[in-house]
């Protein structure tokens, strides 16, 4: 059972997350031949103050 964990900065819309889930599922089905019913995708919404880029939080960078 393929299991993908996706970490993204918070703020994406429900539609964007749905698209990520659909496309990651499709990619795993094509890449490893797993039935789509067996693919799991878990999206982690990371608060901007908890995401660091070059030593600075994404919040401080205005991301």
From Swiss-Prot:
Gene Ontology biological process: salicylic acid catabolic process
Transmembrane segments: none
Residues annotated as catalytic: 2
Annotated GO MF terms: isomerase activity
Sorted UniProt keywords: Aromatic hydrocarbons catabolism, Isomerase
Claim: Isomerase is one of the keywords in the record: yes
Catalytic activity, EC: 5.3.2.6
Catalytic activity, as annotated: (2Z,4E)-2-hydroxyhexa-2,4-dienedioate = (3E)-2-oxohex-3-enedioate
Keyword Isomerase included in the entry's annotation: yes
Pathway(s) this gene product operates in, as recorded in its UniProt entry: Aromatic compound metabolism; salicylate degradation
InterPro entries: 4-OT, 4-OT-like_dom, Tautomerase/MIF_sf
Function: Catalyzes the ketonization of 2-hydroxymuconate stereoselectively to yield 2-oxo-3-hexenedioate.
Family label: Belongs to the 4-oxalocrotonate tautomerase family.
Subunit structure as annotated in this protein's UniProt entry: Homohexamer.
Name of the protein: 2-hydroxymuconate tautomerase
Species, as recorded: Comamonas testosteroni (Pseudomonas testosteroni)
């Amino acid at each position: 059972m393929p299991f993908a964990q996706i970490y993204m900065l918070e703020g994406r819309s429900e539609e964007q997350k749905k698209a990520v889930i659909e496309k990651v599922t499709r990619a795993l089905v094509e890449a490893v031949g797993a039935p789509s019913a067996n693919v799991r995708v878990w999206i982690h919404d990371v608060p901007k103050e908890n995401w660091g880029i070059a030593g600075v939080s994404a919040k401080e960078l205005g991301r």
